[in-house]
């Protein structure tokens, strides 16, 4: 008997990853499905001020998916990731100063990485969020500065990539999906896509 990709039923769709993130593109390709990358046409990432911090990523993922209208035969995947340290939301740093400030906040402490994901077809939109808890060792000023100068983490929530040098030397523990910290919780996404019959 010849085995087939468990997601082969998705071949009836034209799949769009509506994200400019090279990491999400890399991660989605690990599921073995054909897709195209077309970033969502969303100019801002505003959310209602009363939105609980844990709900922000899923709200933004749904907002991005709602802005995408490619036709009935498309399946759209959007995502948004935030880092929450205490009750403070850390998005993408705008400059080196912000990146260093974020790394100082994370240094020697625990934080949460939350990724919201939306999957949209012509008939419906499904969404979820995944939470991963990450523990960081204390970082020296030189370690933080060298990382920011060398890796320029301005496209990463919380100013770090767990798969990069800072993750190797700084992350002491993780509870939850590693891929979620990179920007796409693959197991949860696979489960949702598997159920799209």
Question: Where are the model-predicted features located?
Answer:
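Anionic-ligand binding patches
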Residues: 2-12, 50-197
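Cofactor-binding loop segments of dinucleotide-utilizing enzymes, especially the Rossmann-like FAD-
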Residues: 20, 40, 122
């Amino acid at each position: 008997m010849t085995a087939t990709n468990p997601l082969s039923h998705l071949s009836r769709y034209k799949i769009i990853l509506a994200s400019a993130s090279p990491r999400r593109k890399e991660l989605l390709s690990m599921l073995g499905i054909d897709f195209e990358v077309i970033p969502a046409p969303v100019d801002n990432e505003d959310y209602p001020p009363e939105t609980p911090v844990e709900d922000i990523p899923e709200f933004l993922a749904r907002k991005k998916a709602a802005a995408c209208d490619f036709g009935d035969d498309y399946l759209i995947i959007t995502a948004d990731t935030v880092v929450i340290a205490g009750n403070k939301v850390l998005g993408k740093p705008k400059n080196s100063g912000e990146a260093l400030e974020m790394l100082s906040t994370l240094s020697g402490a625990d934080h949460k990485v939350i990724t919201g994901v939306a999957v949209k077809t012509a008939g419906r939109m499904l969404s979820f969020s995944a939470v991963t808890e990450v523990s960081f060792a204390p970082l020296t000023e030189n370690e933080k500065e060298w990382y920011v100068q060398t890796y320029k983490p301005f496209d990463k929530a919380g100013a770090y990539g767990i798969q990069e040098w800072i993750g190797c030397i700084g992350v002491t523990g993780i509870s939850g999906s590693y891929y979620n910290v990179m920007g796409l919780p693959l197991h949860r996404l696979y489960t949702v896509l598997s159920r799209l019959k």
